[in-house]
């Protein structure tokens, strides 16, 4: 059986907070990796996909990119899912957040590693809505430039009519996801990851 190694790196949305933590564990269904792996078992049953969850609650885009660089120096990955930016928005400009994320994207591209760049999930605070929109627009624009870089619209999948986090996907604080929220983005990722692996002939 073929194998592939997928690095999932980011903040609490990658970790699975509040009901799951990659170190302390908890409810595995409160992580997008659970639902993504379940979906890939149907589309690619002949591949054993190993997911490395490097989500750290509270981490910023700069911290995520620093950890990404370290991770890629020691391990070879077939695919990276790099998600971040939520924790920056209260203290960092949208331009700087995007610059930090693009640094991480470029790190993957230079190593010729397939990359999925999700949008920042919705935040249920009006002041944050335009910030999320601005950064996400930049992420989508970046991904459109390259064949081996893929956009995953987490925000579009999770938001309501106000561009807030939809109630059924909300764990209760307007930022973190419920099990249904993690299921939503995990299922969303299945065809995107499937496409990325196809380009690598996996």
Where do the PLM segments sit?
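Active-site segments of SGNH/GDSL-like serine hydrolases
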Residues: 83-89, 104-135
């Amino acid at each position: 059986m073929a194998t592939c190694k997928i690095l999932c790196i980011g903040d609490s949305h990658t970790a699975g907070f509040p009901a799951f933590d990659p170190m302390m564990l908890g409810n595995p269904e409160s992580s997008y990796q659970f639902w993504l792996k379940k979906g890939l078992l149907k589309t690619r049953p002949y591949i054993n996909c190993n997911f490395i969850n490097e989500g750290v609650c509270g981490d910023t885009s700069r911290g995520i990119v620093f950890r990404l660089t370290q991770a890629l120096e020691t391990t070879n990955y077939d695919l990276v899912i790099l998600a971040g930016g939520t924790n920056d928005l209260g203290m960092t400009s949208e331009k700087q957040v995007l610059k930090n994320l693009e640094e991480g994207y470029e790190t993957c591209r230079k190593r010729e590693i397939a990359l999925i760049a999700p949008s920042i999930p919705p935040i249920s605070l009006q002041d944050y809505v335009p910030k999320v929109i601005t950064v996400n627009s930049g992420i989508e624009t970046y991904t459109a430039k390259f064949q081996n870089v893929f956009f995953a619209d987490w925000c579009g999948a999770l938001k309501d009519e106000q561009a807030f986090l939809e109630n059924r996907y909300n764990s209760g604080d307007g930022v973190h996801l419920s099990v249904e929220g993690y299921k939503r983005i995990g299922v969303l990722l299945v065809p995107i990851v499937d496409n990325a692996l196809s380009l690598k002939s996996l």
